[in-house]
């Protein structure tokens, strides 16, 4: 069986001018040599297999035709001056040259062991690997390490593809085990930008996860952005904190109200109740109850009224102490007596003679009590008593 090798040509994924994988160039012919139970290379994946002249890199010799040549001068993959990467593909189209002397004549079930030694071309029929992680695996962990160092967090436009790619994407083991699936994403960068932004964020560790969580609609797996970031469901973290603070403040107020201080006791003491004896009342003090004066009390009050219709406070206190009354009772009696006297004078029931002294005294009363007439201070008690009875 012919073991003629072919060259797989594809450009570096982070070139801004090209897509993720280049289309077949004109002038090259696809040439496959299939082994008995090996899987053929799928042309729909956009990986051209070209034959023709052998391409050499900057420091590498031509690759062997039968895959048996040993080239120790090339430390890793072969690059040409314009920056494109060339790798040899054998019967399976899945094994690249890494600078070691190997026969690339392996069966498909040995493919997982050869993954760290590949230049990034993954088998199209193995869904356990990714087109992206297979490309990044060698350059992040291999011997060369200069072309793809730090390219795991590339920009969204660097992953734009000119072909329609159907594949399954998995995150690498160090990142997480969340399953990402992008089905039938197409050419332009603005269309696939958000989805690749979420995917690239997954490769960047915790910082990338924060960036990837901005596009939760692109994550088809079971990853919840809010739960992954440690936030409570529904985003009600801050309102719950506010409610807890308010609840704590209310509890503090209740605890403060439970304590009774000395200044609070003073305010809470009830006011002193007025004694009934202060008003001379037998019942409730707020109800208008008529005071029953004795004959002796009435005689002494009438004598004082004849001498002076208006009492000073000192005289009122003295009379109240003598008659066993309070000041309020004496004051109210004198007010009622003056009103009665005015009523008599208005009706003309009093015709007593007036003296000059009484007239001068009446002028003083007019200024204070607005009364025009008054009984003379020299009137006999008998006549005053008779006038009260007539009234």
Curated annotation (Swiss-Prot):
Localization in the cell: Nucleus
> Which keywords are on file for this protein?
Developmental protein, DNA-binding, Homeobox, Nucleus, Transcription, Transcription regulation
Give the molecular function GO annotations. DNA-binding transcription factor activity, RNA polymerase II-specific; RNA polymerase II cis-regulatory region sequence-specific DNA binding
> InterPro entries annotated for this entry?
HD (IPR001356), HD_metazoa (IPR020479), Homeobox_CS (IPR017970), Homeodomain-like_sf (IPR009057), HXA1/B1/D1 (IPR046327)
* Domain of life from the UniProt record: Eukaryota
Where do we find the motif Antp-type hexapeptide here? 260-265
Entry's family note = Belongs to the Antp homeobox family. Labial subfamily.
Q: What does the UniProt record say this protein does?
A: Sequence-specific transcription factor which is part of a developmental regulatory system that provides cells with specific positional identities on the anterior-posterior axis.
- State what protein this is by name: Homeobox protein Hox-B1a
